[in-house]
Amino acid sequence: MSLVACECPPGPGLEPEPCSRARSQACMYLEQIRNRVATGTADVTKRDYLVDAATQIHLALERDVSEDYEAAFNHYQNGVDVLLRGVHVDPNKERREAVKLKITKYLRRAEEIFNCHLQRTLGSGASPNTGFSSLRLRPIRTLSSALEQLKGCRVVGIIKKVQVVQDPATGGTFIVKSLPRCHMVSRERLTIIPHGVPYMTKLLRYFVSEDSIFLHLEHVQGGTLWSHLLSQDHFQYSGLNSGSVQEKSQAQLSTRLSLMTPAELTPGHTLRQNRIPMEPPRTSQSLPPALQLQKEADAEPSSRPSAVFSSDPTEAPCGHSHSQVRRAGQSSNPAPTQRLHWVREGADRVLGAYGRGRGRNPPSANRASLGSGRAAWSLREGQVKQWAAEMLLALEALHQQGVLCRDLNPQNLLLDQAGHIQLTYFGQWSEVEPRCSQEAVDCLYSAPEVGGISELTEACDWWSYGSLLYELLTGMALSQSHPSGFQAHTQLQLPEWLSHPAASLLTELLQFEPQRRLGAGGGGTSRLKSHPFFSTIQWSRLMG
């Protein structure tokens, strides 16, 4: 029936029912179309609400890590509102359940932010000096970058638990280290992002995801200090007797199986360390200039001082042989004039020392030697002194900004192309649970109080510092010369030929009680710098 027929007046005896029925059917048809359009719009809305919520949550995560807590709280609130509105009309049951879990998680985090930061700030007016993560470090937050910037980068290698990544734009490489985020944020542990720390690798940027924080770190090309010292060429030019092929192979086996053996730079290779070692051992052709200078000096004695290391005419090379061992506090005989060396133990002895860690039984009081172990290397005290000064400045700056290392060990000491020490990056994040390397604890690199119930102070790092210097100066690990562990009554074993300033420094650093260690307490770092061992160091020049 046409619309024209409907508009014609009804004839005599005819009812208008056909016209009304047609009009009713048309209305029903239009209503069906409207319903279909409305349903399609709702489906689009259901899909869009997840996108809108994800945008808000992403902004909340960025602001959260940047410690802009008020903005983070607002973004979390907006994201939750979007999810609440969308979840009620979402027809997918599984998706609704997943969204409800996310809502609970984001509400919990928003509540933590309010209780830990906003409520305290609004109620009592927190001072900007109440924590290292407040206004004092505000400029460092500009390093926060969008996670999407990492997507175009290519992983070219894996070293321990970090990735070597290549920037496609520049072709340069950098290190990416991921830190897992915990859902419960500590109120006592503030986020501290150190900057301006001398002799420490630089944090270039950082990225935040829902579950992790990714650190974009400078790639120090020189590798670890220990990898250079343990390399075959360094064994030869350090003056160690090469001996027979069998003896040389045994030393190489011990080196390869030791804790400090660096990882091969191969994609997909994973190891257990949680710090950032760099390159495998280098040959003499690729040694840093500082070590090349030392190699030449050993081959042809010269009065010309190294361009990198300070000169001390009275020092004796470390790692010389000894007929007996003096305990800490005893006088020292003059250092021998010829290069003799300890007889190093086999690989089984080295591994046994590393495996024992801190035992409960103290070493024998009548022990008269460090065993039949041979020093891993022989270094001039001036070299160790320079590296020690650089490490000291790095630790001083970290402590000033409120960061403790807790497990400083050989994996954290890198060597740049100029021969200077570079610490791996240390920081602190409120949402990242601090973890201490168990291997560092077992091998006596961590202080005795680490892992206990007492609160840690800067003194724990000065123990680690002393343990590393002990190994650099003597050529033997502290755990190797003290295989039964270190207790309050343990006497520090020192070689007879060690200089008096070096022996004094090690004795004062390796004190079982934290408060008795050199460097602990107020003004401790100044006292450490003033120790006779550093008498030839020009601190202002190192800082420049």
From Swiss-Prot:
SUPFAM superfamilies: MIT domain (SSF116846), Protein kinase-like (PK-like) (SSF56112). CDD domains: MIT_SNX15, STKc_RPK118_like. GO terms for cellular component: ribonucleoprotein complex; ribosome. ATP binds at residues 151-159, 177. Coiled coil: none annotated. Its EC number is 2.7.11.1. Residues 303-313 have a biased composition (Polar residues). The active site is at 407 (proton acceptor). One of its GO terms (molecular function) is ATP binding. It is an enzyme of class 2 (transferase). The keyword Kinase applies. Residues 87-115 form the MIT domain. It catalyses: L-seryl-[protein] + ATP = O-phospho-L-seryl-[protein] + ADP + H(+); L-threonyl-[protein] + ATP = O-phospho-L-threonyl-[protein] + ADP + H(+). Residues 262-344, 353-372 are annotated as: Disordered. InterPro entries: Intracell_Sig-Traffick_Protein, Kinase-like_dom_sf, MIT_dom, MIT_dom_sf, Prot_kinase_dom, STK_RPK118-like. Residues 145-534 form the Protein kinase domain. Gene3D superfamilies: Phosphotransferase system, lactose/cellobiose-type IIA subunit, Transferase(Phosphotransferase) domain 1. Keywords: ATP-binding, Kinase, Nucleotide-binding, Ribonucleoprotein, Ribosomal protein, Serine/threonine-protein kinase, Transferase. Belongs to the protein kinase superfamily. Ser/Thr protein kinase family. S6 kinase subfamily. This is Ribosomal protein S6 kinase-like 1. It comes from Mus musculus. The lineage of its organism: Eukaryota, Metazoa, Chordata, Craniata, Vertebrata. The gene is Rps6kl1.
